[in-house]
């Protein structure tokens, strides 16, 4: 098994990015990318701008791509620029720079249309579906569609250019790392199904960097009592 150590991390200033830097920083040599100056060393790149992306991944063995508009309510314009164009530019830079593996932050929302919901962040707790990766996607938002685009672009680059691709359909991770913060709110049942702890997020990305695969999709949620994905 090839071990990758020089890792690019886009969207490093987001919740997941900070969790990974804290949890994996001693194991990997990270090059962090952000859109603006932050309180840790980073390279500023807008990934929807080709001129800024070119050369960004030189010397890297793998990239964890988190940068995107993360909101299920995101507008088409934002999704188009940050999630679609950004994904294309990241894949092209992986190809140009010889990056071996891309770990892509996809989302649980790619299959939310298989549940009864009123908004992308509510679930009907009376409907129990163990959704599986081999089922057709059923996105609930433009955001979810953009993540399916990323998964399929990853498949194309895996087949055509040999890029190893791991797409993680991530649940709901919060900075507080405490699902009880949603108790009594409309999002409580959603959180009980989708919560992803910091510990499990770190372990999932470690395994995504290490697993022997050419192309892989995986659910990434904690062992929640009300989970709707077949783990």
Residue ranges and their predicted role:
Residues 4-26:
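N-terminal Rossmann NAD(P)H-binding glycine-rich loop of SDR-like oxidoreductase domains
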Residues 35-50:
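Rossmann-fold cofactor-recognition segment
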Residues 46-82, 93:
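NAD(P)H-binding glycine-rich loop region in Rossmannoid oxidoreductase-like domains
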Residues 89-140:
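Conserved Rossmann-fold NAD(P)-dependent oxidoreductase catalytic core, especially the SDR/UDP-sugar
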Residues 142-149:
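Active-site helix of classical SDR
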Residues 145, 166-170, 185-207:
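Substrate-positioning beta->alpha
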Residues 151-176:
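Conserved beta-loop-beta element that borders a ligand/cofactor-binding pocket
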Residues 182-183, 217-218, 223-231:
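Conserved C-terminal active-site "lid" loop/helix of NAD(P)H-dependent oxidoreductases
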């Amino acid at each position: 098994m090839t071990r990758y150590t020089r890792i690019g991390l886009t969207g490093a200033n987001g919740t997941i990015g900070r969790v990974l830097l804290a949890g994996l920083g001693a194991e990997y040599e990270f090059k962090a990318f952000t859109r603006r100056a932050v309180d840790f060393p980073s390279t500023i790149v807008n990934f929807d701008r080709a001129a800024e992306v070119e050369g960004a991944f030189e010397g890297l063995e793998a990239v964890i791509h988190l940068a995107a508009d993360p909101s299920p309510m995101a507008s088409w314009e934002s999704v188009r620029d940050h999630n679609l164009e950004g994904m294309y530019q990241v894949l092209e830079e992986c190809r140009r720079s010889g990056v071996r593996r891309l770990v892509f932050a996809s989302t649980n929302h790619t299959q939310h249309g298989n549940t009864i919901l009123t908004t992308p962040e509510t679930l009907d707790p009376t409907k129990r579906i163990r959704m599986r990766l081999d089922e057709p996607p059923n996105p609930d938002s433009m955001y979810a569609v953009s993540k399916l685009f990323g998964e399929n672009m990853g498949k194309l680059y895996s087949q055509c250019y040999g890029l190893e691709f791991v797409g993680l359909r991530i649940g709901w991770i919060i900075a507080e790392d405490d699902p009880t913060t949603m108790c009594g709110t409309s999002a409580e049942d959603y959180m009980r199904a989708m919560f992803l702890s910091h510990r499990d997020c770190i372990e999932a990305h470690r395994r995504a960097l290490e697993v022997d695969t050419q192309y892989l999709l995986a659910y990434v949620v904690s062992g929640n009592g009300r989970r709707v994905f077949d783990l």
